[in-house]
Amino acid sequence: MAQPLGSVSAGPGGWTHAQPAEAGFAPDLEARLDKAVADKRVWNLHGLVVARHGRLVLERYWEGQDFAWGRDIGRVAFKADTIHDLRSVTKSIVGLLYGIALAEGKVPPPEAPLFQSFPDYADLGADPARARLTLHHVLSMSMGTDWDETTVPYTNPANSEIAMEFSPDRYRYILERKVVMEPGKHWTYSGGATALLGRIIAAGTGTPLHAYARRVLFDPLGLGPTEWTVGRDSVPSAASGLRMAPRDLARIGHMLASGGAFQGARIVPATWLERCFTPVVSCDERRRFGYQWYLGDFVFGQPPRARLERWWGAFGNGGQRLFVLPTFEIVVAITAGNYDTPDQWVPPIRVMREVVLASLQ
C-alpha cells in the first residue's frame, strides 16, 4: 500500500545535557519513570525525551514490537537515532509547514475560499454549502463535512482516512463529502483536511511535501534522517506518514517553545504560531484545537496552590506525542507501540502527570 521516501539531513543537531536538578526537576526524575514502568502504570513505550531550556534532561529507549504505517516491522531495540512512526503528529508538523509557506507567499491565507486552491474540482465547489468552506475551516478541522475516523477503526476500510487512501482520487474523495454541520462550529477529526493542506503546500511551493519540509524545517533545525510514507498514488501522507527520531521531534518542540526561532534564526513566523495555538473549536471537555494543534491545560502543584498551566500538543495513533509547556519551556516527545488500542492515551498522560510534572520543582 505504501512505500517510504528517504530523506537525510545535512547534519544532525546535537543536544547539550543537564542533570534533572540543574533543570528544575527533582533528582529522582528517572526513578519516577522506572517506577511507573515497573508498576505497569505505563506500557509499550518505545522512546521518551524530556528537554528544558534547550537541554536534554531525560532520554530513555526500550525494545518493542513496531509497525510502519500498519506494516509489521518486528521487534525493534530502539536507540537515539531510530526513526519511528509519528502517525498523526505529522498533521501538526504540516500545520507548521503551511505557516512557513504562507510567509513565503506560496499559499493562500486562511480566509481564502477552499475551492480557489482546487480549480480542478469546480464541479464540487459549485455546491453552495461547499462554496462556503475556507482554509480556516480546513486548518482547524471544522469543515463540517461527513467524515469519520473516530468511531470506525483504522483496520476497517469504512474508516474515512482509509477510504481516502484507497480512493482513485484522494482529493475528490475529500472534497465531495457532504457538508452536514455548519463550518467553523464543530470539530471533526479529519486526515482529509490535512491532506488538502499538503496538496496546497506542494502545489504552491512547486516542491514535494517531504522535500519542502526538509528544506525549510528539518535542515534548519539540524534534524537527522526522516522518512515520509507515501500512499498508493505516490503522494506523501500529510495526515500520518512522517517517521522521525524522538530527539528530532523534541527539537521541533524546543523551537516552538522558543517562539518559532532556533539558534537566532526565524523558522516559523511568530504570528503563525499565535494562530496555531489560539483555540478555534473544542475537541471535548478538556481539549481545544487551533490550526492543526491540540491545546489544553495540566494541573500543576497541589491544593490549595494548584494552578492550570497550558500545553500545546501533537498526537498520533499508538501513543505518539509531542507536548510543549511554554511557561516552563519544557518539551516532551514520546513514541510508543499501542497502535489502535482504546487505552493508548493512558501511558502518555501518566508520563506527563506522574513523571514530568510530579518531578517539577
Question: Can you annotate each of these PLM segments?
Answer:
Residues 32, 60, 69-74, 113-116, ...:
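Short, charged, amphipathic alpha-helices and their helix-cap/turn boundaries
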Residues 54, 82-110, 138, 197-201, ...:
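Active-site SXXK
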Residues 224-226, 277-331:
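Active-site Gly/Thr loop motif
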Residues 314-361:
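Structured C-terminal helix/loop/strand segments within mature extracytoplasmic catalytic/sensor domains
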Residues 193-200, 240-261, 320-336:
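Active-site-proximal alpha-helical segments within enzyme catalytic domains
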Residues 38-40, 127-128, 162-163, 185-186, ...:
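Short Gly/Pro-enriched turn/cap motifs at secondary-structure boundaries
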Residues 80, 85, 104-145, 176-178, ...:
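Active-site helix/loop module of the DD-peptidase/beta-lactamase fold
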Residues 1-73, 102-108, 140, 163, ...:
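N-terminal leader/targeting segments and the immediately adjacent pre-domain N-terminus
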